[in-house]
């Protein structure tokens, strides 16, 4: 269950708000961005990741203790997420792996250990909120 690590970013099960005279739909509340640092701010970047070679070794993890981090693919593609609970160091015995399906993004909670983005196709281009 990914919920203990953050949000799955999807429009599934969310009723859209029709806007712009019916030419667009807005899906609210798909993820909670968090900037815990006093005076902190969230930024949006474009992140481009090359396909990883498999098999691969998960031999390091990173975390962002001051705020959440979201990856939202700009085209439909799958990617992998390796995550572990908060703590001073990642507990490699508690690492969980997720296949993130087409059309879904993720938002890691602040302090969640994760391996850098793992593209499963030639190129994964995503919006990054940090």
Language-model region placement:
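Non-catalytic, conserved peripheral segments adjacent to functional cores
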Residues: 1-97, 121, 130
């Amino acid at each position: 269950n990914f919920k203990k690590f953050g949000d799955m970013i999807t429009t599934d099960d969310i009723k859209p708000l029709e806007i712009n005279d019916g030419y667009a739909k807005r899906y609210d509340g798909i993820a909670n961005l968090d900037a815990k640092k006093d005076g902190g701010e969230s930024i949006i970047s474009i992140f481009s990741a090359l396909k990883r070679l498999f098999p691969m070794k998960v031999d390091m993890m990173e975390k962002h203790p001051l705020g959440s981090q979201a990856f939202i693919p700009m085209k439909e593609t799958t990617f992998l997420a390796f995550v572990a609970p908060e703590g001073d160091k990642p507990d490699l015995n508690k690492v969980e792996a997720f296949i993130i399906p087409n059309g879904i993004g993720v938002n890691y909670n602040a302090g969640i250990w994760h391996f850098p983005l793992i593209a499963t196709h030639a190129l994964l281009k995503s919006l990054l909120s940090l």
